[in-house]
A protein has these predicted regions:
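Bacterial Sec-dependent N-terminal signal peptides
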Residues: 1-37
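Pepsin/retropepsin-fold aspartyl endopeptidases
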Residues: 22-417
Length: 417
């Protein structure tokens, strides 16, 4: 006989229990979440405001960056990262060997330490008309993690002291005057710095997992994560989620971020609450990692772009505040999934992550496969934004996989959840 126990965990620090410190929560619409349309986003982008810096959003935020005045780079912005990161291959292609390079090990979302280099020289770069000089950069194999189209990442050093608007729907970033006030409809969320370095922010988020378990937690703001809400394995142990959840899907990544392999357990949360807004039936995950960032106990998990994409976002990096306003895509939940995480390569898409028991898995797709076409389309015909939309569409996939020197065609339906 199953005994039901109502366990409500309140883990939020008293200083950030609510959003009342700098704003007032706005009532949200009671409309049911809507599903994404096939092979499309919900709405089309509008013209950019004056001074805006264009970005491409496809799980990550992609920017055109100019390094040392002459070297154009395609970079991802990541609040979970402090300084600039440069891909090893890009570094060798564009910069002379440096006597200031030193070997190092770094820790990220993966289960292990990652070998890298630390360059102690000054690095100048610009995003739009905004210039920054950082003392030092980390050089590592980012393309293994993010794909051949990524040259590097920039992070919190660029944002230090700035107030910045991020618009996921219209695709831009706008550096605001420090005294600028967000428009009507925004709600301020008082955040806290994770430590005295004031380089990583944690914000309060509530999650009702089901009728038995709820959590008011402190989540690291990680705009380098494409996920919505990820619970650390330390929280999973405290909540005893393994005993509570039944409909859980295991997803394993060969390269799940800096630090190598990663295992996530995917499930649907009844409700996620942030800044007074409720997102229903959201796909979230908890980590199975025993080491690395996702096993930390100084915060409860990650808030990624999969949650933030429902809002217009203004971050005051000087005051450690985040202002949120539901955008035109608010509540539009993704109902279909390919079951795979694909890393773009020059000659195809590498199957880096795969959900066990998914339709793709049961049809014969394996981690490490290289897909050379999807429904007759090659990588040259599908950019990152289109690939994201295709992955969440209802449309069946027919993929060609290059395996053991020969091509194999596999067709499967998307998983619906």
């Amino acid at each position: 006989m199953r005994v039901k126990s109502n366990i409500i965990f309140a883990l939020t620090l008293s200083a950030i229990l609510g959003t009342t410190g700098c704003g007032k929560a706005k009532k949200t619409s009671s409309n049911e979440p809507q599903a994404l349309t096939q092979d499309e986003e919900i709405v089309q982008a509008r013209p950019l405001p004056e001074g805006a810096i264009p970005l491409d959003y496809a799980g990550h935020l992609y920017f055109d960056v100019m390094m040392r005045d002459t070297v154009a780079a395609r970079m991802i912005f990541d609040t979970g990262n402090t300084e600039i990161l440069i891909d090893t291959h890009f570094f060798k292609e564009h910069f002379a060997p440096s006597p200031t390079l030193q070997r190092t090990l770094i820790q990220g979302a993966g289960n292990s330490l990652e070998a890298a280099y630390r360059d102690t020289a000054e690095w100048e770069y610009s995003v739009g008309e905004h210039h920054t000089t950082e003392q030092g950069a980390t050089v590592l194999d980012l393309r293994k993690i993010l794909g051949y189209h990524v040259d590097g990442m920039f992070g919190m050093e660029f944002m230090r002291g700035r107030k910045v608007e991020f618009n996921y729907v219209d695709g831009y970033m706008l550096i605001l005057p420090q005294d600028a006030q967000p428009e009507e409809g925004y709600v301020c969320v008082k955040c806290k710095w994770l430590d005295n370095r004031q380089a990583r922010m944690v914000m309060p988020v509530g999650i009702k997992i089901n009728d038995e378990v709820a959590l008011d937690g402190n989540f690291l703001v990680d705009m380098g994560s494409s996920g919505s809400l990820s619970l650390n394995s330390s929280v999973v142990a405290r909540l005893k989620l393994n005993r509570v959840l039944s409909n859980v899907r295991k997803k394993t990544y060969d390269t799940g971020g800096v630090g190598g392999s990663r295992t996530d357990y995917l499930f649907k949360a009844d409700k996620v609450t942030v800044a007074g807004n409720e997102l229903l039936d959201m796909q979230v995950n908890y980590s199975g990692n025993t080491q690395g960032m996702m096993a930390e106990d100084s915060f409860d998990g990650l808030v990624g772009n999969g949650l933030l994409e429902h809002f217009d976002v203004v971050i005051d990096f000087a005051k450690c505040e985040i202002w949120l306003r539901p955008n035109r895509n608010f509540g539009a939940m993704k109902r279909y999934d390919s079951g795979m995480t694909l890393t773009p390569q020059a000659d195809g898409w590498l199957v880096n992550g795969l959900t066990e028991g998914s339709n793709a898995h049961r049809a014969g797709v394996m981690r490490g496969d290289v897909i050379t076409s999807i429904n007759g389309l090659t990588p040259r015909e599908v950019d990152i934004k289109r690939l994201k939309a295709m992955g969440y569409s209802e449309e069946d996939w027919s993929v060609v996989i290059k395996r053991n020197g020969s091509d194999e065609k596999i067709t499967f339906k998307k998983d619906k959840y």
